[in-house]
């Protein structure tokens, strides 16, 4: 049981770090024809990044930014609550609070990346038809899966 909790803790930390990276880095869409990429915050072309996104004033990208930041916050809160529950909770109880907080993180990731997918991932306004999703977009979907698994495992596990 201790090994399972330690492994869950390590995966939770890795998920939080991956959420930081996927939110901060500017590689959500990559152009095949040039050294160019677009993120949530900046547009990078030829190694020069500027804060001017072609869709920067749209409400959808602001919603994606907000939900990704909320997912990071809820992931960190869940991690702190888990550590707190690990040392203060009585034996036999479940990690409901940390699990439910992680599932809120999962929901924030789902909403944020779904909005991005609907509005920007397949649009030709970013580059052209020869662009593809970058590693941040893929990393966010991986974090989506990990946060769901972590949240469910927190809800199921009991402290021994």
From Swiss-Prot:
GO CC field: plasma membrane
Glycan-carrying positions: 35, 43, 128
UniProt-listed Pfam families: PMP22_Claudin
Gene3D superfamilies with a match to the protein in the record: 1.20.140.150
Membrane protein topology class: Multi-pass membrane protein
Compartments it resides in: Membrane
SS bond list: none
Transmembrane parts of this sequence: 1-21, 67-87, 95-115, 137-157
UniProt record, GO biological process: apoptotic process; bleb assembly
InterPro entries in UniProt: EMP_1, PMP-22/EMP/MP20-like, PMP22/EMP/MP20/Claudin, PMP22_EMP_MP20
Keywords attached to this entry: Glycoprotein, Membrane, Transmembrane, Transmembrane helix
Chief place of localization: membrane
The family this protein is said to belong to: Belongs to the PMP-22/EMP/MP20 family.
PANTHER family named among the record's database cross-references: EPITHELIAL MEMBRANE PROTEIN 1, EPITHELIAL MEMBRANE PROTEIN-RELATED
UniProt-recorded name of the protein: Epithelial membrane protein 1
